[in-house]
Amino acid sequence: MGVGGTLEYISELIGNGGSHSYGKRKKKKQFQTVELKVRMDCDGCVLKIKNSLSSLKGVKTVEINKKQQKVTVSGYADASKVLKKAKATGKKAEIWPYVPYNLVAQPYIAQAYDKKAPPGYVRKVDPNVTTGTMAVYYDDPSYTSLFSDDNPNACSIM
């Protein structure tokens, strides 16, 4: 145990009030930005959301874009706790479901286009989902059998 280890040991003793926690170390939360989609109708709703999320421990900034119904929370708070706190205000809240249009490799999947998406955004879609893009193959009758006398579903113009 060098000088660095000794200083670390002493700071842990002082920081924990003298309790011995040799093997237990607290995980430091990482700084993160959480984006939410929250339904807000009026300025009162905006104020209610802002005050609620600002009171959360670890939150540094709360930015609200009322036009896009978007709330951006920056700080050391966990995303699930931020979402839970936003829902506790009585508003419909979810993690921001959109990504900028230019970041999507192929936004040609049918579910990516959402009429409610803000301009320049498309809905996040799992790239493995290919619903609607797969062609359905079935046995086409050959052209020679379409006009055959043996085929009851053949040309019936007469």
UniProtKB/Swiss-Prot annotation:
Q: Where is the lipid attached (S-farnesyl cysteine)?
A: C155
- One of its Pfam families is HMA
PROSITE patterns membership: HMA_2
Q: Which stretches are tagged as propeptide in the UniProt entry?
A: 156-158
Q: What keywords does the record list, in alphabetical order?
A: Lipoprotein, Metal-binding, Methylation, Prenylation
| Database matches in InterPro entries | HMA_dom, HMA_dom_sf
Positions contributing to a metal cation binding: C42, C45
Give the modified residues of type Cysteine methyl ester. C155
The Swiss-Prot or TrEMBL record annotates one GO molecular function as: metal ion binding
Locate the HMA domain: which residues? 31-94
Q: Which family does it belong to?
A: Belongs to the HIPP family.
- What is this protein for, i.e. what is its function? Heavy-metal-binding protein.
Subunit structure as annotated in this protein's UniProt entry: Interacts with ZHD11/HB29.
Q: Which PANTHER family match?
A: COPPER TRANSPORT PROTEIN ATOX1-RELATED, HEAVY METAL-ASSOCIATED ISOPRENYLATED PLANT PROTEIN 23
Q: What is this protein called?
A: Heavy metal-associated isoprenylated plant protein 23
**What species was this sequence derived from?**
Arabidopsis thaliana
High-level lineage: Eukaryota, Viridiplantae, Streptophyta, Embryophyta, Tracheophyta
